[in-house]
Design a protein with these regions (language model features):
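A conserved helix-loop-strand patch within extracytoplasmic ligand-binding domains
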Residues: 77, 85-88, 105-109, 113, ...
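Alpha-to-beta junction loops
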Residues: 76-78, 94-103, 145-146, 177, ...
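Extracytoplasmic small-molecule ligand-binding "clamshell" domains
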Residues: 34-104, 174
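A ligand-binding cleft/hinge motif common to bilobed small-molecule-binding domains
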Residues: 88, 105-113, 158-163, 184-219
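Ligand-binding cleft/hinge of the Venus flytrap
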Residues: 52-54, 68-77, 155-175, 204-208
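Periplasmic-binding protein-like
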Residues: 46, 122-130, 197-239
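Bacterial lipoprotein signal-peptidase II cleavage site
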Residues: 18-30
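Extended ligand-binding regions for polar small-molecule ligands
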Residues: 24, 65-74, 133-136, 140-141, ...
C-alpha cells in the first residue's frame, strides 16, 4: 500500500474492462508462509465503479475488489465483501459488522477521529460533471443551479468548503449513490454533479458524448483503507 496509483490509470483500466493488482515480484527463494489471519469482512458501496460495483452477472468487481482480494491472499485470510449504506460506513465499521472500509474511501481529518487509515494508495480529485450540451463552463456558473453529490461522500465536504460556491447554489442535492445522481443529471433534474474523478472518468468514457468534465474541480484528496482505531494489528498487515 506504499505507492500511490494514478487515478487516470484506474479509470482507463476500468473503462477497458481490465483490472488487477499487479504482478507479484519473483522471489529468489521460497517465502515463508504468512501467519494465518482471521477472515476479513470488507465494507463497500457496490455502486461505485470502477472501484467496486456489480457486473452483468451481478458479481462484485472493481479495482478495490481486486486489491482487497490480493491482500487477503498474501495475508492468508478469507476476504468477504459486504455492501453497506455508505452514509453509515463508520457505524458499520465501529459496530464490528465489517472489519475494513475499502472502496474509494477518502482520508479526511474528520474521519481520522473514528477511523485508522493506511498509507494513501491513490490520489483523487472531486470533479464537476455536466451534460455535454450544458452551458456551464466553470465553477462560478454553478450559481443558482442544482448541484448533486453522494450523501456521506467527501464531495459534500469539498463543496461546503468552497463557501462562495456553496452559498450561491439553488440546492445541494444529496443522493444515496452516484449512479442515481447521474441518472438525474441525464434526466435534467440536476445541473451538475460533483463526484470522485475515478467514477466521473469511468462514466464519461463509457458514455462518450453524453457527459463533459469541467476544467475546474473541488480539490485533490487521497484514498486509503480504513480499520477500527484499535485494530492496529490488521492495519499493520494491510499497510505492508
Amino acid at each position: 500500500m506504499k505507492k500511490q496509483i494514478s487515478v487516470l490509470v484506474v479509470a482507463l483500466m476500468a473503462a477497458a474492462m481490465i483490472s488487477g493488482c499487479g504482478k507479484k515480484e519473483e522471489a529468489s527463494a521460497p517465502a515463508a508462509a504468512p501467519a494465518p489471519a482471521a477472515a476479513i469482512v470488507v465494507g463497500l458501496d457496490d455502486n461505485f465503479p470502477p472501484m467496486g460495483f456489480r457486473d452483468e452477472k451481478n458479481a462484485l468487481v472493481g479495482f478495490d475488489i481486486d486489491l482487497a482480494t490480493e491482500a487477503g491472499k498474501r495475508l492468508g485470510a478469507e476476504v468477504t465483501f459486504k455492501p453497506i449504506d455508505w452514509n453509515a460506513k463508520e457505524a458499520e465499521l465501529n459496530g464490528k459488522r465489517v472489519d475494513v472500509l475499502w472502496n474509494g474511501l477518502t482520508i479526511t481529518e474528520e474521519r481520522k477521529a473514528n477511523i485508522l487509515f493506511t498509507t494513501p494508495y491513490l490520489e483523487n480529485r472531486q470533479i464537476i460533471v455536466v451534460l455535454d450540451n450544458s452551458a456551464i463552463k466553470n465553477k462560478a456558473e454553478l450559481a443558482g443551479k442544482v448541484l448533486g453529490v453522494q450523501d456521506g461522500s467527501s464531495a459534500v465536504e469539498a463543496v461546503q468548503k468552497d463557501e462562495a460556491i456553496a452559498k450561491s447554489l439553488k440546492e445541494l442535492k444529496k443522493f444515496p449513490d452516484n449512479v442515481t445522481a447521474l441518472m438525474d443529471l441525464s434526466a435534467g433534474r440536476l445541473d451538475a454533479l460533483v463526484v470522485d474523478e475515478v467514477v466521473g472518468r469511468y462514466y464519461t468514457a463509457k458514455k462518450s458524448g453524453e457527459y463533459r468534465v469541467l476544467e475546474e474541480n473541488f480539490g485533490t484528496e487521497d484514498y486509503g483503507v480504513g480499520t477500527r482505531k484499535d485494530d492496529t494489528e490488521l492495519m499493520g498487515k494491510i499497510d505492508k
